[in-house]
């Protein structure tokens, strides 16, 4: 017992700084638990306790500086017009959208099939091939009807699966979306079906955009991530997409110690090919039929990828060239735009204008739109570089490139359509997105409540993608079956196999 006469007891200091509290999930049973946000050295961790499964910790960011900097970017949210479920169990168990959700959907992600021609160890969704689900035309009609009714404009729709190119009516679905007034039609694919040039030609005629999952250039790494060697096939597919001028995004899932050393090579590929519009890096997430059993040493965070990019580019791009998305929670996306200079080379947009300007240009869109605000920013950059030509080494080439772009995008003799401007601007200004998906271990209710990416339902509902993948897809018999759920149970770290 402490003797009061001897003074107060010596204080024992913790090895972390307590920053705040959020709501998360138990990594085993997925029950809601409190998560203390702790700064440990220069990293950010969630510290959780589940009454049934004990103490759990997970890293959520490898840089306190980035974590706090991202939170300094604040933008207003636009709640969804349609609420389909009441608040009952509390977020994230009432999706959706429920009255707690703070952001309308800007990117509807529509899984049109559960069929897939790969069984990837990194797959973070659930897909059954036996008795595979194929979305009907009627179901898509209902979904599109709700999307159009609930939004002033739907700029983009993404088709996913499974493997969406295995749906026999995918071209028809694209035509339906175009008829509904949707401008950007994207297909997330592993690319194997795109070996068929006639099929690529058909998609090109529909002005479809391809989001190609290219994770590595090494066959042995591809087997670790995808369970197959698809590298040559995907590079051949990229050549076909270039031949038919199909706008393409390269989407790698990045795992620490597996393929994170290839981020620079993937960025070089994107910058070198005119038809490749962007690079979207997804952090490895440990949920779904494959990801739940993947080694946890592969967890990587947004600041880790900033460092890989900075190292690969020799500092030509660093973390301060990125900003969060104004549409989402600041810790979900990190976005960098680069101006591709005439004659080769590039300069990050944030070095020509301020990060605040870049954040403002993104506004209420997933992308910088080539509209009048961008025209004014380009003119401001010209004025700034004329006044301070030594501010960046490439001043003369930047001036020449921006002047040409201004003439191409905003000619004095006629007004271009937004689609015409997009095609011009996307070849000159490329984007690097880092998207931090969540699993049951690093789940953050504060993030999911602001999610602008949703899985639309036939009844008009919309479920945020991370909630959908972690909590809801496994309950949907169109995508999940008992065998798949059992495999997920026994491959989870620390799990004990039980009979089906």
Q: PLM ranges: what are they?
A:
Residues 1, 232, 243-426:
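Radical SAM enzyme [4Fe-4S]-AdoMet core and its adjacent flexible, acidic
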Residues 1-82, 339-500:
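Radical SAM enzyme core and accessory elements
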Residues 42-62, 66, 72-189, 193-198:
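Conserved alpha-helical substructure of the radical SAM core
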Residues 45, 107, 209, 249, ...:
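Broad gene-expression machinery/nucleic-acid interaction feature
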Residues 50, 89-98, 106, 116, ...:
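Functionally engaged cysteine thiol sites
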Residues 126-130, 217-220, 286-287:
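A short, flexible beta-alpha/helix-coil linker loop
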Residues 126-134, 223-230, 294-295:
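Short glycine-enriched, charge-decorated loop/helix-capping segments at active-site entrances
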Residues 141-158, 167-284:
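Radical SAM/AdoMet-radical enzyme domain recognition
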């Amino acid at each position: 017992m402490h003797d009061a006469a001897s003074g107060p007891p010596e204080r024992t200091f913790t090895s972390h700084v307590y920053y705040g509290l959020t709501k998360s999930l138990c990594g085993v049973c997925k029950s809601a638990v409190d998560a203390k946000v702790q700064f440990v050295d220069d990293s950010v961790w969630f510290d959780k306790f589940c009454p049934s499964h004990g103490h759990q910790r997970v890293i959520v960011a490898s840089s306190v500086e980035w974590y706090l900097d991202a939170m300094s970017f604040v933008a207003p949210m636009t709640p969804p017009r349609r609420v389909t479920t009441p608040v009952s169990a509390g977020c994230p168990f009432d999706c959706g959208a429920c009255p707690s959700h703070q952001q309308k959907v800007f990117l509807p992600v529509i899984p049109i099939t559960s069929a897939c021609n790969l069984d990837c160890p990194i797959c973070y969704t659930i897909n059954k091939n036996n008795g595979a689900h194929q979305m009907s035309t009627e179901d898509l009609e209902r979904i599109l009807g709700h999307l159009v009714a609930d939004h002033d404009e739907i700029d983009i729709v993404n088709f996913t699966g499974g493997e969406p190119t295995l749906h026999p009516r995918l071209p028809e679905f694209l035509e339906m979306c175009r008829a509904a007034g949707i401008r950007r039609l994207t297909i997330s694919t592993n690319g194997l079906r795109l070996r068929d040039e006639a099929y690529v030609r058909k998609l090109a005629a529909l002005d479809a955009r391809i989001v190609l999952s290219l994770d590595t250039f090494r066959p042995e790494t591809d087997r670790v991530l995808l369970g197959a060697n698809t590298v040559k096939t995907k590079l051949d597919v990229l050549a076909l997409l270039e031949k038919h001028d199909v706008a393409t995004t390269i989407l790698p899932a990045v795992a620490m110690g597996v393929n994170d050393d290839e981020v620079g090579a993937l960025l070089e590929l994107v910058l070198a090919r005119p038809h490749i519009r962007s690079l979207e890096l997804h952090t490895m997430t440990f949920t779904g039929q494959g990801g739940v059993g993947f080694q946890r040493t592969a967890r990587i965070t947004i600041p880790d990828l900033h460092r890989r990019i900075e190292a690969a580019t020799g500092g030509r791009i660093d973390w301060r060239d990125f900003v969060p998305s104004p549409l989402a929670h600041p810790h979900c996306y990190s976005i960098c735009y680069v101006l591709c200079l005439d004659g080769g080379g590039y300069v990050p947009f944030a070095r020509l204008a301020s990060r605040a300007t870049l954040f403002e240009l993104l506004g209420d869109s997933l992308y910088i739109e080539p509209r009048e605000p961008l025209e004014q920013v380009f003119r401001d950059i010209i004025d700034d570089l004329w006044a301070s030509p030594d501010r960046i080494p490439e001043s003369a080439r930047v001036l020449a490139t921006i002047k040409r772009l201004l003439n191409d995008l905003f000619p004095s003799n006629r007004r271009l359509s937004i689609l015409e401007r997009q095609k011009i601007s996307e070849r000159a200004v490329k984007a690097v997105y880092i998207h931090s998906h969540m699993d049951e271990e690093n789940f953050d209710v504060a993030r999911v409540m602001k999610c602008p990416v949703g899985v639309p339902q036939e009844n008009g509902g919309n479920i945020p993608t991370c909630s959908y993948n972690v909590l809801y897809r496994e309950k949907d018999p169109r995508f999940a079956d008992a065998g798949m759920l059992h495999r997920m149970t026994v491959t989870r770290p620390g799990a004990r196999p039980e009979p089906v």
